[in-house]
Amino acid sequence: MKISIVDIGSNAVKYKIFDANNFQLIEYYREPLRLGRDVFNGGKLLSSTMNRLINLLQDYSDIFNRKQIVHRYFIGTSAIRDSKNSDLLVKKLNNKNINLKILSGKQEASLLKSFNEDIPNSA
């Protein structure tokens, strides 16, 4: 069984696929979208940026479908958390059956710390 984790960050959107039995990293991909440029300058995602993000996440979801990955985690961090229109993004993604979890700053720090300490080859 495999699991996938998608990290939607300020500079890039990354996914990692792990073997759930031994947490060995199987695949990694990074796409620079620079979401922070919109959010930190204008307070929200521009519609063009949001559409690029939605299309990318749909592409990732399609990849996970082809690889028969059932356990998928789409995680939004700082840029999504700080965006004034993150609720619209969540709604649009829900319409595509993509469940986005937006982490608080404290949750993000705690999760990344434990993830990097507990799972080999996760950095």
Language-model region placement:
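Nucleotide/phosphate-binding catalytic cleft detector across ATP-hydrolyzing
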Residues: M1-S10, K16-A123
